[in-house]
């Protein structure tokens, strides 16, 4: 009833922002029904009147020691092939605690691990 903000998680690559090799690998390794569901969920938020932030995640893996992340604005090529779940949690915490929410208001932001510009995640 008094929802002030929604953080939605979605997959990266739905807007053609991945390099060709990473995009091909991603879509070759996910069921089309999953990709369609991700698009539909993203569109529900975009068509709402909510203050939302959609976080576009690349391939996830676990590493409690690695919380490195970078934020990639929508419309910018997203080169990072992977990011840790721990880094995503840190990014969400950081976004929720910024003084100025303006960059995140009704925005779609990619989260990736710096320096992981691979054709597929390193763990595959």
Go through the PLM ranges and name each one.
Residues 56-61:
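Conserved SDR Rossmann-fold cofactor-binding beta-strand/turn motif
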Residues 18, 63-71, 96-106:
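Glycine/proline-rich active-site loop of Rossmann-fold NAD(P)-dependent oxidoreductases
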């Amino acid at each position: 009833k008094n929802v002030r903000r929604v953080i939605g998680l979605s997959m990266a690559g739905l807007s053609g922002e991945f390099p060709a090799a990473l995009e091909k690998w991603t879509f070759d390794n996910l069921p089309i029904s999953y990709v369609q569901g991700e698009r539909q969920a993203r569109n529900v938020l975009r068509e709402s009147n909510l203050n939302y932030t959609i976080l576009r995640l690349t391939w996830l893996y676990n590493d409690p020691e690695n919380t490195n992340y970078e934020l990639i604005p929508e419309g910018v090529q997203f080169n990072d092939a992977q990011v840790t779940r721990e880094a995503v949690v840190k990014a969400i915490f950081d976004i929720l605690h910024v003084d100025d929410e303006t960059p995140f208001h009704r925005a779609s932001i990619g989260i990736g691990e710096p320096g992981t510009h691979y054709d597929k995640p390193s763990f595959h």
